[in-house]
């Protein structure tokens, strides 16, 4: 179907592809290098949103390798319910070593307060404007004292551009 083809194209731009039998195959991925460059240039705590489970796991692993395991936590469908609030509490604690919140915007984009961050990176987007707006509002809400910067990682000439255009 067209939707399946579009999803596969999007996965490829993110650095992996899921085969028909459910196997995830990593691909050469410059996006993760770009993300690490953005993080190096960012100060303070950073929220990173990604659509795919494999991307969230890869991002968490790469950040842990670069900055240390204690600096990153992931928040997505596989995150146990009893751990989720402690991740948010730890991230909101300005004295905590937890600097990077990596999440799926459908899982973590609703109801959370993450105002300790003024940098939000979209590693990938989906077509839902509602999901995008809700995830943006995690950092930009009452309690935020700084201007929030939103960064979209976009591979030129790919489906990324179409998705971001649809969101605008």
Description of each model-found segment:
Residues 108, 126-127:
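Flexible glycine-rich beta->alpha loop in the catalytic core of nucleotide-sugar glycosyltransferases
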Residues 49, 103-104, 122-124, 153-154:
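Conserved beta-strand segments of the P-loop GTPase G domain that flank and frequently precede/overlap
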Residues 101, 119-121, 139:
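Short, well-ordered beta-strand core segments
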Residues 11, 77, 125, 153-156:
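Active-site donor-binding loop signature of nucleotide-sugar glycosyltransferases
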Residues 127-168:
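A conserved SF2-helicase RecA2
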Residues 112-125, 148-152:
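A short beta-strand element within the Helicase C-terminal
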Residues 1-112:
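Conserved Helicase C-terminal RecA-like lobe
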Residues 59-62, 112-116, 133-134, 164-165:
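Short amphipathic alpha-helical segments
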């Amino acid at each position: 179907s067209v939707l399946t083809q579009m999803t596969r194209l999007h996965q490829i731009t993110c650095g992996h592809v899921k085969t028909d039998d459910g196997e995830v195959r990593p691909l050469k991925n410059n996006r993760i290098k770009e993300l690490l460059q953005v993080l190096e240039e960012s100060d303070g705590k950073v929220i990173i949103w990604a659509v795919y489970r494999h991307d969230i796991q890869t991002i968490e692993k790469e950040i842990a390798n670069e900055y240390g395991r204690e600096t990153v936590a992931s928040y997505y469908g596989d995150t146990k319910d009893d751990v989720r609030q402690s991740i948010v509490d730890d991230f909101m604690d300005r004295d905590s070593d937890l600097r990077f919140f990596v999440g799926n915007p459908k899982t973590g984009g609703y109801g959370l307060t993450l105002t300790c961050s003024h940098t939000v990176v979209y590693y990938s987007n989906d077509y839902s404007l509602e999901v995008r707006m809700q995830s943006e509002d995690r950092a930009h809400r009452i309690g935020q004292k700084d201007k929030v910067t939103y960064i979209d990682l976009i591979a030129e000439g790919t489906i990324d551009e179409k998705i971001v255009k649809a969101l605008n």
